[in-house]
Design a protein with these regions (language model features):
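Core catalytic region of metal-dependent phosphoesterases/phosphodiesterases
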Residues: 8, 13-123
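Beta-strand-turn-beta hairpins that frame and shape the catalytic cleft
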Residues: 1-6, 134-141
């Protein structure tokens, strides 16, 4: 049977696009994929970012509120409509709590209460946490996308990782949506196919205050992997500015709240 895997992109809650995320969760409830995987940066943790260090943002005291927003905006609504497997991958933004403790309060290292799975209640929501790239499908690794250099072209960062690792790669981090691939053949016979698949983002662009003039070559969306035995077919899903998107010939998406 054909397995359908939904791959969610960077949300960076609380800087997520509320309408887009609600639309994707609504789609998941109707589509009922076999598995859900997220490429990382589900939360942002700006209070403990190195960019915030020593500024007013570090002293806001709203870290718990941001953690609660993750549950309220994503995990709780998702679990109301979907009971299947959910997997999260480590990422640079989700590394921030560990990095902050390691560099500012090393005496607290190893305290599970300060680790991301505890901060965001992964056990309560049935979320499996991965600290390394992992095999999501035959011949495919899921990674965050910050494990190598960045490409300006959508799919290029993932393909570079694929060349380095010898697997096809699906990742996030770049906020770009697209596929690059290279196939090899000899004597008219395909000997290897390798894909680099980047799944876009679910951020609210206006929340990225660090962008000059609000400009970025980013694409909102997510991904689907269709798995049939050892054959994997990647499919990017573009989210239009009005929040709608098309999967398998059917339009999904919710109007603005």
């Amino acid at each position: 049977p054909l397995k359908r895997i939904v791959v969610l992109s960077d949300m960076q809650i609380p800087y997520h696009d509320k309408r887009a995320l609600r639309g994707v969760i609504d789609f998941i409830g109707k589509y009922q994929p076999d598995e859900i995987h997220s490429v990382g940066d589900e939360g942002d943790f700006p209070q403990i970012s190195r960019w915030t260090r020593g500024t007013a943002g570090e002293y806001k005291g709203d870290l718990q509120a941001h953690c609660d927003t993750f549950g309220r905006s994503f995990a709780q609504p998702l679990r109301k409509v979907y009971a299947g497997p959910v997997h999260f991958e480590r990422s640079n933004h989700m590394d921030r709590p560990l990095t902050y403790v390691r560099t500012r309060a090393p005496g607290l290292m190893g305290l599970k209460a300060l680790e991301v799975p505890s901060l965001l209640n992964f056990e309560r929501y049935g979320i499996t946490w991965h600290e390394e790239p992992y095999e999501i499908a035959p011949g495919w690794l899921l990674a965050h996308g910050d494990e190598g250099g960045a490409s300006r072209a959508p799919g290029g960062t993932a393909l570079a990782l694929a060349r380095k690792w010898g697997y096809s790669v699906v990742c996030g981090h770049t906020h770009k949506l697209g596929i690059q691939h290279e196939h090899m053949a000899v004597n008219s016979k395909l000997t290897r196919e390798r894909f680099g698949f980047e799944v876009g983002n679910l951020m609210e662009l206006r929340s990225a205050k660090y962008l000059k003039a609000g400009h970025a070559n980013w694409q909102q969306g997510f991904g689907i992997l269709y798995v049939e035995k050892n054959r994997v077919t990647p499919a990017p899903v573009f989210i239009r500015p009005n929040g709608s998107f098309v999967v398998e010939g059917k339009t999904y998406g919710l109007p603005a709240a």
